[in-house]
């Protein structure tokens, strides 16, 4: 078993690529189940946010795991694998665990130290647990990672005055207008990002705030908290006509603010308008940026604003990275104690030995086979072995954390004809590799 992470984020892919590779919340469970059915995949969790789409998986083999993760991503989003590959990154084993710790603690975020990602990781883990795509390894890993991130935010100053994307949006507005006194702002969307923006706007001098949302009741709840007005979604353009600043953050799959409509609107509007799109996929058509006096910013445009982090926070990051390295070591020490890895390897090697004997016999009995036919038969035979072993391996992992784990594992070895010698040889090889 190996831990493998595949993904893309704001470091590796621009927004026009990221927005095409976002898992819709309504499809998360189906995506998890579909991926779990792929060969080589034993466990999986999918994290999909505005700045990253990452899959954390337990696989039976690294090289096959890489292939099936890429194939799943390409198939799910109906894109050629070759078009996706340049934007993907892979982390294996300790690097994968290290990366997840950093992501969850906010150290890999566009906004250093932000806490929103912790909730997003917890949500992703909960969905995977409910869907039964996690097991022994990922259950342990995610619990440890979430606990660590909570301690980080509680005991350090990494998130003290942490710049958020919503904060950055407000800062952009201040830079453009100098002062926000008496400016009119329209928020399209009533989710978490809009709420954060309203918190950052407190005391900024904004005179008029209107919240527009497809579900009016959600807009009303938010408006009551911040003494804002509620606008009708169907009359959005009328409200935009009067706005100085527009912040858009909805879960819409397609842009809701179109270039043609904005072209007409801006020709009638007497003043310029700042539009900040922090949705992913983007909520505003990119071509709107070419309209005179229509100042459009998306998430990637805000990167420069949020990159200025204090030296104190950078120092804390360096200390946390050392702590994370220790956490990673502890996790793999725990994994070694499971005692099932040598059993799994012994089982796999026994199966491969049987395959080799069978292939040799086949070659002798059917000398007329071409090399291509021989190779194809070998591939299919290996595929059958992998599928046959997938469920027993999953069950063995679950046995390893039960109270009577030792007895259960011994029964497992007897059922599959694994001798103590078979397992001991593997254990010695592992010890030599680690040393």
Swiss-Prot record:
Protein name as catalogued: Glutamyl-tRNA reductase
Q: What is the lineage of its organism?
A: Bacteria, Bacillati, Bacillota, Bacilli, Bacillales
- From the UniProt record, report the name of the gene that encodes this protein: hemA
Q: Which keywords does this Swiss-Prot/TrEMBL entry list? A: NADP, Oxidoreductase, Porphyrin biosynthesis
CDD domains, alphabetized: NAD_bind_Glutamyl_tRNA_reduct
- Ligand binding (NADP(+)): 189-194
Cited InterPro entries: 4pyrrol_synth_GluRdtase, 4pyrrol_synth_GluRdtase_dimer, 4pyrrol_synth_GluRdtase_N, GluRdtase_CS, GluRdtase_dimer_dom_sf, GluRdtase_N_sf, NAD(P)-bd_dom_sf, Shikm_DH/Glu-tRNA_Rdtase
Q: Site (Important for activity): which residue positions?
A: 99
Q: Which HAMAP family match?
A: Glu_tRNA_reductase
């Amino acid at each position: 078993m190996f831990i493998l992470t595949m993904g893309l984020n704001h470091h590796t892919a621009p927004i026009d690529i990221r927005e095409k590779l976002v898992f819709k919340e309504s499809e998360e469970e189906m995506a998890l189940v579909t991926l779990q059915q792929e060969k080589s995949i034993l466990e999986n969790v999918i994290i999909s946010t505005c700045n990253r789409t990452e899959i954390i998986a337990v696989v039976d083999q690294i090289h096959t795991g890489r292939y099936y993760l890429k194939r799943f991503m390409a198939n799910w989003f109906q894109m050629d694998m070759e078009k996706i590959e340049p934007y993907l990154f892979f982390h294996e084993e300790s690097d994968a665990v290290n990366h997840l710790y950093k992501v969850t603690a906010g150290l890999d975020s566009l906004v250093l130290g932000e806490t929103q990602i912790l909730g997003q990781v917890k949500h992703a883990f909960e969905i995977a647990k409910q869907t039964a795509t996690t097991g022994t390894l990922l259950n342990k890993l995610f619990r440890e990672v979430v606990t660590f991130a909570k301690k980080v935010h509680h005991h350090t100053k990494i998130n003290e005055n942490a710049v958020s994307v919503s904060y950055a949006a407000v800062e952009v507005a201040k830079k453009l207008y100098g002062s926000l006194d008496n400016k009119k702002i329209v928020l399209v969307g009533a989710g978490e990002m809009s709420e954060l923006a309203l918190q950052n706007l407190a005391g900024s001098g904004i005179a008029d705030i209107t919240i527009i949302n497809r579900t009016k009741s959600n807009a009303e709840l938010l408006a009551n908290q911040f003494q804002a007005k509620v606008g009708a979604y169907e009359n959005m353009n009328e409200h935009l006509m009067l706005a100085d600043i527009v912040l858009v953050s909805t879960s819409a799959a397609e842009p809701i603010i179109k270039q043609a409509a904005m072209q007409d609107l801006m020709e009638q509007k007497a003043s310029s308008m700042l539009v900040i799109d922090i949705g992913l996929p983007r909520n505003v058509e990119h071509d709107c940026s070419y309209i005179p006096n229509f100042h459009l910013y998306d998430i990637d445009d805000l990167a420069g604003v949020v990159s200025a982090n204090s030296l104190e926070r950078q120092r804390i990051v360096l200390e946390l990275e050392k702590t994370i390295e220790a956490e990673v070591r502890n996790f793999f020490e725990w994994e070694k104690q499971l005692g099932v890895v040598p059993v799994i390897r012994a089982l796999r090697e026994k199966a491969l030995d049987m395959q080799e004997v069978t292939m040799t016999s086949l070659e002798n009995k059917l000398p007329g086979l071409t090399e291509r036919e021989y190779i194809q038969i070998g591939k299919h035979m290996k595929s059958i072995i992998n599928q046959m072993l997938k469920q027993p391996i999953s069950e063995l992992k679950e046995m390893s954390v039960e109270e009577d784990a030792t007895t259960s594992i011994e029964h497992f070895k007897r059922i599959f004809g694994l001798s103590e010698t078979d397992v001991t040889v593997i254990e010695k090889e592992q010890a030599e590799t680690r040393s």
